[in-house]
């Protein structure tokens, strides 16, 4: 549920930036000072930045992995309140969350390389 809210916030920020850039008269007419001011206003209006959202997502994946590890350790110690199915489900959730995070990282690195290889 929180991932959906994070995505919605990111989409709102992107839409606000798009509106502001079109208000400047298109890509050829953007004044750098006005663009920076518009970006600052969008940040204030739309909440956390992309980096903050990414950090929150990484922290959430870390929490899921720690919970899975803790549950597995409890099961190995013989805690009767922990069932093997719960351990397996938590382990799979942690694995899926980590795989998704790696995919996002790979896409970000690819996008960064594309931007860096653009001719000026």
From Swiss-Prot:
GO terms for biological process: bacterial-type flagellum-dependent cell motility. GO terms for cellular component: bacterial-type flagellum basal body. Keywords: Bacterial flagellum. GO terms for molecular function: cytoskeletal motor activity; structural molecule activity. It holds the Pfam family FliE. It comes from the Bacteria. InterPro entries: FliE. It is found in: Bacterial flagellum basal body. Belongs to the FliE family. This is Flagellar hook-basal body complex protein FliE. It comes from Teredinibacter turnerae (strain ATCC 39867 / T7901). The lineage of its organism: Bacteria, Pseudomonadati, Pseudomonadota, Gammaproteobacteria, Cellvibrionales. The gene is fliE.
């Amino acid at each position: 549920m929180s991932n959906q809210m994070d995505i919605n916030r990111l989409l709102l920020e992107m839409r606000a930036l798009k509106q502001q850039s079109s208000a400047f008269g298109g890509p050829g007419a953007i004044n750098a000072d006005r663009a920076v001011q518009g970006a600052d206003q969008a940040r204030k209006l739309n909440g956390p930045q992309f980096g903050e959202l990414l950090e929150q997502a990484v922290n959430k994946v870390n929490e899921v992995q720690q919970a899975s590890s803790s549950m597995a350790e409890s099961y190995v110690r013989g805690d009767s309140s922990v069932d093997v199915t719960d351990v397996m489900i938590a382990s799979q959730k942690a694995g899926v969350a980590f795989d998704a995070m790696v995919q996002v990282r790979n896409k970000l690195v690819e996008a960064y390389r594309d931007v860096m290889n653009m001719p000026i």
